[in-house]
């Protein structure tokens, strides 16, 4: 076995020749001599055969990493206006590694390339797109994507086009849907937000995916905002929109009736009926808590269609979500509600919030007046003494 293939300390032309020799030694169809057309032609030919590294069993991932690192160091030295095809070709090659250990090396190489490109370079988008693809392959998506705000910040200096962001959001949703449904749901909502009134009708498939992802996510309970998204509005009158409306504002019996009439549709969307029931019970509890400061266990049994021995475990599960603040009285077989998140937040809720804030303001004004009165009395008493 040869020693580590390190090229970074050499001049660019020398690096290119050593890379040619190394790749030819692995069986690549490339000459050992430098191109007479210059470094860009050298790099074009080197990138064209660099995936031969992924078929070689005589070099460690660390050695392959050194080779790819050398290629990256040459790429970033090429002027941006002449490097686009080279970067796109290199990114494509990095998706070819089959073995997990080598795919991780490719991920590192793409990250180096992404990090070393100017933040104003439009090519960073293309590198990042391939970065996500490879991250999915090695189950390391969380290393390159932590949230929509972080993503926007990365491209703040050179925002991708609307179409590019839609393509990226679709990829991220596909990557996240099985491992992080909550984040996948947020990505899909962001995707739908990129559509305008003019093109919302073309977002049918994205809108349906967004709804299904949100319904399937066990941690997404505030579904009302989806109804205001333009692409979702275009689905009004269709079964998927009707199902969303049930989850937004109806109770468990409405869902059970919908499932009874449209069982095949629900199953065809990949939704789990038992998980849907579990979610609808929690949403129904939230709705009951909005108008009831206390509820008996028997009331919960009837409303949520659960057995007597299931009531206490259910309440505990509700409290774990922190959507409802409550106290369970096992002796009296009641639950006392302190507060709950509203399933919908429309004009009545805004009015309620306004009234509450005005009440606080009035109380604080009264407290301040009382303090001023006491303070004035103390000052007057002190002056008399």
UniProtKB/Swiss-Prot annotation:
Residues 180-342 form the PCI domain. InterPro entries: ARM-type_fold, COPS7/eIF3m, eIF3m, eIF3m_C_helix, PCI_dom, WH_DNA-bd_sf. The keyword Transferase does not apply. It is found in: Cytoplasm. One of its GO terms (biological process) is cytoplasmic translational initiation. SUPFAM superfamilies: ARM repeat, Winged helix' DNA-binding domain. Transmembrane segments: none annotated. One of its GO terms (cellular component) is eukaryotic 43S preinitiation complex. Its main location: cytoplasm. Keywords: Cytoplasm, Initiation factor, Protein biosynthesis. GO terms for molecular function: translation initiation factor activity. Component of the eukaryotic translation initiation factor 3 (eIF-3) complex, which is involved in protein synthesis of a specialized repertoire of mRNAs and, together with other initiation factors, stimulates binding of mRNA and methionyl-tRNAi to the 40S ribosome. The eIF-3 complex specifically targets and initiates translation of a subset of mRNAs involved in cell proliferation. Belongs to the eIF-3 subunit M family. Component of the eukaryotic translation initiation factor 3 (eIF-3) complex. This is Eukaryotic translation initiation factor 3 subunit M. It comes from Anopheles gambiae (African malaria mosquito).
């Amino acid at each position: 076995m040869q020693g580590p293939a390190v090229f970074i300390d050499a001049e660019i032309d020398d690096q290119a020749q050593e890379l040619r020799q190394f790749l030819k030694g692995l069986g690549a169809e490339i000459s050992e001599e430098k191109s007479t057309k210059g470094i860009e032609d050298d790099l074009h030919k080197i990138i064209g055969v660099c995936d031969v590294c992924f078929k070689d069993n005589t070099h460690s991932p660390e050695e392959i990493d050194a080779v790819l690192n050398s290629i990256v160091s040459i790429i970033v030295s090429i002027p941006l206006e002449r490097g686009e095809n080279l970067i796109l070709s290199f990114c494509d090659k990095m998706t070819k590694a089959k073995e997990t250990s080598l795919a991780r090396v490719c991920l590192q190489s793409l990250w180096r390339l992404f990090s070393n490109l100017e933040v104003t370079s439009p090519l960073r988008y293309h590198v990042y797109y391939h970065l996500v693809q490879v991250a999915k392959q090695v189950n390391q998506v969380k290393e390159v994507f932590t949230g929509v705000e972080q993503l926007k910040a990365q491209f703040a200096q050179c925002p991708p086009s609307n179409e590019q962001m839609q393509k990226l959001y679709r990829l991220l949703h596909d990557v996240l849907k099985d491992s992080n449904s909550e984040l996948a749901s947020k990505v899909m909502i962001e995707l739908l937000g990129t559509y305008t009134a003019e093109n919302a009708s073309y977002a049918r498939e994205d809108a349906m995916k967004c709804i299904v992802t949100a319904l399937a996510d066990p941690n997404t309970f505030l579904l009302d905002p989806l109804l205001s998204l333009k692409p979702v509005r275009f689905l009004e009158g269709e079964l998927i929109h009707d199902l969303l409306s049930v989850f937004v504002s109806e109770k468990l019996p409405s869902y059970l009736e919908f499932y009874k009439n449209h069982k095949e549709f629900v199953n065809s969307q990949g939704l789990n009926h038992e998980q849907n029931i579990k979610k609808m019970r929690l949403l129904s509890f939230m709705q009951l808590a909005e108008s009831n400061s206390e509820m008996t266990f028997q009331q919960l049994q009837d409303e949520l269609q659960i057995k007597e021995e299931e009531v206490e475990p259910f309440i505990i599960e509700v409290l774990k979500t922190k959507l409802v603040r409550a106290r369970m009285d096992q002796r009296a077989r009641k639950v006392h509600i302190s507060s709950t998140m509203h399933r919908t937040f429309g004009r009545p809720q805004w009015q309620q919030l306004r009234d509450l804030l005005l009440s606080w303001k009035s109380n604080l004004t009264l407290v301040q007046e009382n303090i001023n009165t006491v303070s004035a009395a103390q000052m007057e008493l002190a002056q008399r003494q």
